[in-house]
């Protein structure tokens, strides 16, 4: 079981390095793979930082998100937090659903970046 978990984490880590991330006009936010189930985004912190429940400093995270741009709502489905060396710090799933984002937050920047990207592809 431990070997399977290690293989899974290595696959996620290598996927974060191999993805083609498109920079958005919002600092630190990059757009990745777009699917019918959501959009993968990457957020890079200006400086590595500690997160609650993490086991080290985080340099960036990758999240699968769904957006409701018409109503300014974002659903963060899953987050994977990484250290600078690419090792996984924490994986979180969020069964909450769509929510308003706090003004001037990372979530609001992600929502704006995703909605801007989606409107440019219409």
What are the language-model segments listed below?
Residues 17-122:
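N-terminal secretory-pathway/extracellular module detecting exported/lumenal segments
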Residues 4-13:
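Sec-dependent N-terminal signal peptides
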């Amino acid at each position: 079981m431990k070997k399977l978990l290690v293989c899974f984490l290595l696959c996620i880590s290598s996927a974060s390095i191999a993805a083609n991330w498109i920079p958005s006009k919002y600092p630190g936010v990059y757009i990745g793979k777009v699917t019918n189930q959501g959009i993968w985004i990457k957020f890079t912190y200006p400086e590595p930082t500690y997160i609650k429940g993490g086991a080290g400093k985080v340099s960036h995270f990758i999240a699968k998100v769904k957006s409701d741009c018409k109503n300014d709502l974002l659903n963060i489905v899953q987050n994977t937090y990484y250290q600078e060396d690419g090792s996984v710090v924490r994986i979180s799933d969020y069964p909450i659903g769509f929510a308003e984002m706090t003004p001037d937050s990372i979530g609001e920047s992600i929502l704006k970046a995703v909605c801007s990207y989606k409107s440019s592809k219409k």
